[in-house]
A protein has these predicted regions:
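Short Pro-Gly-centered flexible turn/kink motifs
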Residues: 61-65, 270-287
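Extended, loop-rich substrate-binding clefts of extracytoplasmic carbohydrate-active enzymes
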Residues: 66-119
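Short, structured beta-strand/loop micro-motifs enriched in basic residues and often containing a Trp
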Residues: 45-51, 257-265
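Acidic-aromatic substrate-binding/catalytic surfaces of carbohydrate-active enzymes
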Residues: 12-67
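Glycine-rich active-site loops that engage anionic ligands at enzyme catalytic sites
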Residues: 218-258
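Active-site/ligand-binding surface loops and adjacent short beta/alpha elements
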Residues: 145-229
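Acidic, contiguous internal or C-terminal segments within carbohydrate-active enzymes
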Residues: 97-146, 151
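Beta-strand-rich interaction surfaces with strong enrichment in secreted/lumenal proteins
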Residues: 112-114, 267-272
């Protein structure tokens, strides 16, 4: 696997060409704050989701009168990116439309994924360019899996606390699609105590109201200050018993149960005019 390593005096990050996916996020003492990718549970670490978030009905999307096979979270995470820029503290990987991508998604695009270090923070930015001559619908998101418990937080309870103090409604998946019936918020005054039992029914989705930032970690130990830009939807996910929690800011969600397979009809779909550019990012700062 081709890896690019970036580092500063505080952090080291490894990024793979496959999916432009972060593979490790380590502090100077060698502790990795990112999930290890243990195949017993889940081999992912920090996939980039494009051009779709979540599932489509029967894993099929339609664009106009044409139908295309599209697996969960799109194809970017399984695609080989090209390294186009590398410096000590940042790197950029690129994926461009090709005959292979147009067989699944009939649009011309460029997707640049940058990883950049600033002190004890890593900033990941996806820049999407519509290189075609028609409006391009898409979904995009991030899926970073952080260690649970965090290094140095073993034996301590962990929580997620929203910066906005909100209590967003919870939505659940049914067969990989969003059940449109809202449930009571599991947050109390912006705080959710993490419990593996809460994920026995798959991910916890918060399409609206989660704001733009949170703190994940233990109350008196290590934590991560996590924020995002231009991504209105949010989800939490793990596999019960696994040592990670995914903090997932999205633009777009899975299709709804009973909903259309049309890409432009999916909830929270984004649209780029010909020649336009969209930017999306998250920032994770390690504390403690």
């Amino acid at each position: 696997m081709q890896l690019t390593r970036i580092s500063n005096s505080d952090l080291t990050v490894d990024v793979a060409a496959l999916g432009a996916e972060m593979q490790a996020l380590s502090t100077r003492d060698g502790r990795n704050w990112l999930w290890s990718g243990d195949a017993t549970y889940w081999t992912g670490r920090s996939p980039v989701l494009f051009p779709m978030v979540g599932r489509a009905p029967m894993d099929v999307i339609s664009v106009g009168a044409e139908r295309y096979q599209m697996g969960q979270h799109g194809f970017a995470r399984r695609s080989a990116f090209t390294l186009v820029e590398e410096w000590r503290e940042h790197c950029i990987y690129r994926l461009e439309s090709s005959e292979a991508t147009r067989a699944m998604y009939p649009f011309d695009f460029r997707l640049d994924v940058e990883h950049r270090l600033e002190g004890r923070a890593v900033i990941v930015t996806a820049t999407i360019t519509n290189r075609g001559d028609k409006v391009m619908p898409y979904g995009v998101g991030f899926h970073p899996a952080f260690a649970w418990p965090l290094p140095g937080g073993e034996g301590q309870s962990h929580s997620v606390t929203l910066d906005n103090g909100g209590e967003p409604a919870l939505f659940r998946l049914s067969g990989g699609l969003v059940n449109p019936e809202p449930l009571a918020s599991p947050f109390e005054r912006g705080r959710l105590a993490l419990n593996h039992a809460d994920f026995e029914k798959d991910a916890m989705l918060f399409p609206e109201g989660a704001g733009r930032g949170l703190v994940y970690g233990s109350e008196n130990g290590p934590s991560i200050s996590f924020s995002w830009e231009n991504l209105p939807n949010f989800a939490l996910w793990t596999k019960p018993g696994a040592g990670f929690i995914c903090l997932e800011p999205w633009q777009g969600t899975a299709a709804e149960v009973g909903g259309s397979d049309a890409l432009d009809q999916r909830p929270y779909t984004a649209f780029l005019e010909a020649g336009a550019v969209g930017k999306y990012s998250f920032r994770a700062e390690l504390v403690g």
